[in-house]
Design a protein with these regions (language model features):
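Peripheral, non-catalytic segments that deliver or gate enzyme domains
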Residues: 2-18, 22-25, 65-111, 115-135, ...
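Intrinsically disordered, low-complexity segments used as extracellular stalks/linkers
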Residues: 11, 16, 20-26, 30-31, ...
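Alpha/beta-hydrolase fold active-site loops
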Residues: 582
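Structural cue for short, hydrophobic secondary-structure segments
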Residues: 586-589, 615
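Active-site proximal helix/loop that lines the substrate pocket
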Residues: 589-592, 620
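A fold-wide structural signal in alpha/beta-hydrolase
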Residues: 607-617, 773
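Active-site-proximal cap/loop segments of hydrolase catalytic domains
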Residues: 618-807
Length: 807
């Protein structure tokens, strides 16, 4: 491995950092300091042969880090880091250049450029499933690099141009693997995530391209025994192989709320997490403290903590972040390890490898952590915003840190801090902020000089470029409303929403979506004017000829308690302006997602049946400030259910929706809201379509992935301490009120919201004489990624809605 990676563990920590302080007490808003102590793995030059496990004096096999060093025990008695992932070579799976296009109306997204900026790796579904492709930014041909059936999720081209790393979701499920392949399609290999029950997530590359960071998730407890009813097959037999069933009894009614044994936490009382931890400024932190304005945001000196819930009850997976050499010249290097964690991602490494920028924590409680890699001392912790996981980066000399953060603010801004030689912040400044708008994407060019910012303005994107002379910051207490001044440049976008920004040497590449086109990739050859890549589908090919996509109009409902709401109304073509029409209220997932004005083939199908669509953002949605996101926490969820009814009333009073022909529909959390709305407001809707929705929050916690449970406990309530609240919020509790027919859809490999949630609601509806049907999609997880299944789903849903609303 090159010197960049070796520097992570080379030398004596005290010699390199003479000013290093002893481990300090953790501030009260960032968790427990000793929950999952990281272990250092010293890389050794070796051949591709793995070293065998060593034997202890007692004769038992000792787990090692992959380089022969024993793994230290964590403070809770569990191993702090799990065995390093083993590299698995795979056969060449690249396709021919410019393979025949199966789907004309295809999407391209998630671009990553080679060092020259002339070629892009990207994800494209022209073959019917998201796959890894590469091609020149300004021409043809393109090439398929992995023709396997597993959907691709993320892509990253190495800084030296020799490798392309990417993640796949075997079986379409929630567990992912990290792979690498040469740009010509050779040397394809699995880097992590092949072990049964594990999952792997892609991080950043070392800046010299010698290694890539990967987070490996390993269950902290043994899987439950298979259920005799076969629930283990429905919940988890897919992506990571058999053996990760959840032991659920599909024949039971309401759950007793007991957690599986693998979620039993350490001693201590559990509690519902209250308001967002970053809203309550709390007591002053012990000195020295890093502050934004007058608000303490973290203290240096502590080791990396785990992600446990208050009171010591944790039920996340064990997460270990490694630096892995795809050439297999050096052993994996452990960067950090935590237990009972929701997330852990390495977002950046300093050029010399001495500092790592980590993102950790459940949604609503994300944090940026600066870690010294030599001694695993935390030098800075700062709350950061949800959304895009790539939260920021170091400057080229690691003398500054740039972050997308909403620490003690309603909206995310660009913050920078000067760093001392040990990685401690010397002070913070606000570089860019906008009143009422979130900074949702942040990218610095590879030379670290230019920042590209994407702002979310009521669901629409605005892209701003900060040149080097403008990146000087404003006063810490300042709240600039329009960036940093007239020197910043704005990019005129051909479509409404930017989903990704990547630098392409001296140029940029943007992934765009819009209300009238499929996702595509644009590049900026002159740095100012986006040009569509030739292999992205044309606007006119977005839908079949004859019926163009509908551009939505914004609506602004008001909740019964006075809270302003937002949404987008789609009018079915061919109707007079004031003509009452059947209307589908469509609810997004999250709950922190946001309805964006982008083309959805499902909407296009429904609109073609003569049905209007109103897609609101009820409380809990992102894009309108942190207070709005947190407005549905705990018992605030009841107000979110009222928001659905209030938005429906607004669609009738302010729009052309026919009050006698209304339906409710949603996916994931939106599926939960659909189930709940049908039993909370049984006379409001004629029918409902729930997609991958929760019907009983107790059984949801029993069956979901541990890291998802970590985040969900913050949003809905803790499954032990708040059992009664979860029972009140569960649609199954009020199933006797159901009147309207319901259509449920679920992916067979969904381990986010297991299929049991749809099965038990449909079964209960039928037992009460209410028409109900369930569509289970094969080889799909929580997201439907295969073209044939997506087509089946949207046609079946539209058929159901048309039948019940036009009868």
């Amino acid at each position: 491995m090159a010197s960049n990676a070796r520097n992570l563990t080379a030398g004596d920590a005290t010699a390199r950092h003479p000013a290093a302080e002893p481990v300090a007490e953790r501030p009260p808003d960032v968790g427990t300091a000793d929950a999952g102590r990281p272990a250092t793995v010293r890389p050794e030059e070796r051949t591709t042969d793995e070293r065998p496990a060593e034997r202890t004096e007692e004769g038992t096999e000792e787990r090692t880090d992959g380089a022969g060093a024993p793994l230290p025990a964590g403070s809770d008695g569990l191993t702090a880091a799990f065995a390093a992932p083993a590299r698995i070579p795979l056969p060449d799976a690249s396709g021919p250049r410019d393979a025949p296009t199966r789907l004309i109306a295809h999407g391209c997204w998630y671009p990553s450029a080679d060092p020259s900026g002339t070629r892009l790796a990207f994800i494209c579904d022209r073959g019917g499933v998201p796959q890894l492709w590469t091609g020149p930014a300004d021409g043809e041909p393109v090439r398929l690099l992995d023709d396997g059936p597993d959907p691709v999720r993320e892509v990253s081209w190495s800084p030296d141009g020799r490798w392309i790393a990417y993640t796949t979701a075997p079986g379409g499920g929630e567990h992912t693997r990290v792979l690498c392949v040469r740009p010509d399609g050779s040397d394809r290999q699995i880097l992590a995530g092949a072990e049964p029950g594990s999952s792997a997530h892609l991080g950043c590359w070392a800046h010299d391209g010698s290694a890539v960071t990967v987070t490996v998730a390993v269950p902290t407890g043994p899987p439950a025994p298979p259920s005799p009813s076969g629930a283990d097959t429905a919940a988890g037999d897919g992506p990571s192989g058999p053996g990760r069933g959840f032991g659920l009894d599909l024949g039971s009614g309401l759950s007793d709320g007991r957690l599986p044994d693998r979620w039993r936490g350490r001693a201590g009382e559990t509690e519902l997490l209250g308001p967002a931890p970053h809203t309550d400024r709390g007591p002053a932190l012990p000195s020295p403290a890093v502050t934004v304005g007058t608000t303490p945001i973290g203290a240096p000196g502590g080791t990396l903590p785990g992600g446990t819930l208050p009171g010591g009850t944790g039920f996340g997976d064990g997460l270990s972040a490694y630096l892995i050499d795809p050439d297999a010249v050096a052993a994996p290097v452990l960067i950090a390890a935590v237990q009972d964690a929701a997330t852990l991602r390495v977002c950046d490494l300093s050029r010399d490898g001495s500092l790592a920028l980590l993102r950790r924590g459940p949604r609503g409680r994300r944090e940026a952590v600066v870690l010294r890699t030599a001694d695993h001392v935390t030098t800075c912790v700062l709350p950061v915003a949800d959304g895009d996981p790539w939260i920021g980066s170091f400057s080229p000399r690691a003398d500054a840190l740039r972050l997308r953060s909403n620490a003690h603010r309603e909206f995310a801004v660009l913050l920078t801090a000067e760093l001392d030689p040990d990685g401690r912040p010397l002070g913070w400044s606000t570089v860019a902020a906008r009143e009422g708008s979130d900074l949702e994407l942040l990218r610095y060019t590879r030379d670290g000089a230019t920042a590209v910012l994407a702002w979310n303005i009521r669901g629409m994107s605005d892209v701003e470029i900060l040149d080097p002379d403008t990146d000087t910051g404003t006063d810490t207490d300042g709240r600039p409303e329009e960036g940093t001044g007239s020197a910043s440049r704005h990019i005129s976008l051909p479509h409404e929403v930017v989903t990704r920004v990547t630098d392409a040497n001296s140029r940029l590449a943007l992934a765009l979506s819009g209300s009238r086109r499929r996702p595509g990739i644009w590049w900026l050859p002159d740095g100012a004017t986006p040009v569509r890549t030739p292999w992205s589908s044309r606007d006119e090919d977005a839908v079949p000829p004859g019926r163009p996509p509908v551009r939505p109009v914004p609506l602004r409902p008001t909740a019964r308690d006075g809270l302003p709401l937002n949404g987008w109304y789609y009018r079915a073509p061919g109707r007079a302006p004031g003509e009452p029409a059947p209307c589908v209220i469509h609810l997004h997932g999250g709950p922190e997602d946001q309805e964006r004005p982008v083309l959805d083939p499902l909407y296009h199908e429904i609109l073609g049946r003569g049905l209007d669509i109103f897609a609101p953002d009820v409380r809990g949605s992102s894009g309108y400030g942190r207070s709005f996101v947190d407005a549905d926490l705990g018992r605030g969820r009841f107000a979110a259910l009222d928001d659905v009814a209030d938005c429906t009333a607004h669609a009738v009073l302010a729009g052309p929706a026919d009050p006698s022909r209304l339906a409710v529909m949603g996916r994931s959390y939106g599926g939960y809201l659909t189930f709940a709305s049908l039993v909370w407001h049984p006379d409001l809707f004629r029918t409902g379509v729930a997609v991958c929705g929760m019907s009983d929050l107790a059984t949801f916690f029993e069956g979901t992935e541990p890291w998802i449970a970590q985040s969900a406990a913050h949003k809905y309530g803790h499954p032990e301490r708040d059992r009664e609240l979860l029972r009140e919020l569960s649609p199954m509790t009020r199933i006797d009120a159901l009147r309207a027919p319901v259509f449920a859809v679920h992916g067979e490999h969904d381990t986010n919201v297991p299929p049991r949630e749809s099965e038990q609601f449909v079964r209960a509806a039928r037992e009460r004489g209410v028409p109900a049907e369930l569509l289970t999609l094969r080889e799909e997880g929580h997201d439907f990624l295969r073209a044939d299944n997506r087509r089946l789903f949207r046609r079946a849903a539209a058929d159901w809605l048309q039948r019940h609303l036009n009868s």
